[in-house]
Amino acid sequence: MSTVPLTLSEILELAKKTLLANGCDEENASILADTIMRAERDGSVSHGLFRLPAYVAGLKSKKINGKARPELENVAPSIIKVLGNNAVAPMVLSLGLPAVIDLAKKNGVAVLAIKNSHHMAALWPETEAIAEAGLVGIACTSYKPAVAPAGATKPLYGTNPISFAWPRPGKTPVVYDMATASMAMGEVQIAKREGHKVPLGTGLTKEGKETTDPGEIADGGVILPFGGYKGSSIAMMVELLAGALIGENFSFETAAKDNNDGGPPSGGEFIIAISPEKISGKGWDKHADEFFTKMSAMDGVRLPGERRHKNRLNKGPRNINEELVNKIKSLS
């Protein structure tokens, strides 16, 4: 695989230039480009420049409104709803996150329901932001069906990621962000592009047979849930929280309404912010740190998010797939 080194500034500039050339206004382009750059910076490459061609396809097909302004509504004392108006998720979150953080600090807990937005990307940026504000953050989202329920061979669920973040005053938060599938679809697609095999148990071919070929999974096959029935049940929970509970589509409904003319279809996200101080009182952070200290002292264990923060400290260039860079340059 040929790669080219790009600095973080070059990644940001390339993403923003491409978005501006394809229908985004300055604010939308700046916010989304920053999200893409941060994903590359932190090693979340399946949510970095890899996603840019799909965003452009969505802009060209008019699924994504590159000039959208989301609308916020306070629907109850601890519930906020944001209508995305076909904006990309980072634009919606720039409005919704500060509001849900303020509300959780005031009331102890707050819910943010996001509707009619496009591609929630990685979830850790929002839960990490919540944790950096001293709150516990939980988020989940669904997408087009790509995952079979346990025992099935056809897709019904999205990869349905969930993210959790725990605040650590004076330290980096503990954050995890994971698909409820055995592997995120973006990782399957990258493995296909780079000619890598995936572990047995990742997915099935379109004939319902196990395979280690990511191409057979991505092209008409299906991903399996992690942990069999356990992961399948968690994926079902995400469908309900990010679908029925907030008045958004289930994954299969999203697929039925998608005309496949390019780019990600719209969907929703469910976010909770909780104040540990309001619930536990003083000393909650020291108590939690005792647990993290115990955990870190065990051989072979690292806290969730440590690798991402280590990547973040590296200010040097990132090696980006050359074919991808050339493709992006052709879009602008």
Regions found by a protein language model. Name each.
Residues 193-252, 257:
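Secondary-shell segments that build the walls of catalytic and ion/ligand-binding clefts
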